[in-house]
């Protein structure tokens, strides 16, 4: 009777699917309301003007406009510059 498990082939062989996290819309891109901006675990980016935060910390646009990344009180924030203002600038 063998006392080795044959290179432990039966105990290996599992891997989880990637979570597809990260920034989905970058600075300067135009978005419509409801579009996902950042998928994240925890608040690496905080919601700014016209940006909402979901239960899984996903940031999404509350209004149409252009994406803008910035900082406020030492935190990275994501803002949406409204489309009307973005068209004039």
UniProtKB/Swiss-Prot annotation:
UniProt keywords, alphabetically: Ribonucleoprotein, Ribosomal protein
Name of encoding gene: rpmA
PANTHER family in alphabetical order: LARGE RIBOSOMAL SUBUNIT PROTEIN BL27M, RIBOSOMAL PROTEIN L27
Ribosomal protein keyword on record: yes
Region ranges (Disordered): 1-25
Biased composition (Polar residues): 7-19
Species this chain originates from: Rhodococcus erythropolis (strain PR4 / NBRC 100887)
Gene Ontology molecular function: structural constituent of ribosome
Highest taxon of source: Bacteria
GO cellular component terms attached to this protein's record: cytosolic large ribosomal subunit
Ribonucleoprotein keyword on record: yes
Protein name, per record: Large ribosomal subunit protein bL27
Disulfide pattern: none
Family: Belongs to the bacterial ribosomal protein bL27 family.
Pfam families linked to this entry: Ribosomal_L27
Gene Ontology terms describing biological process: translation
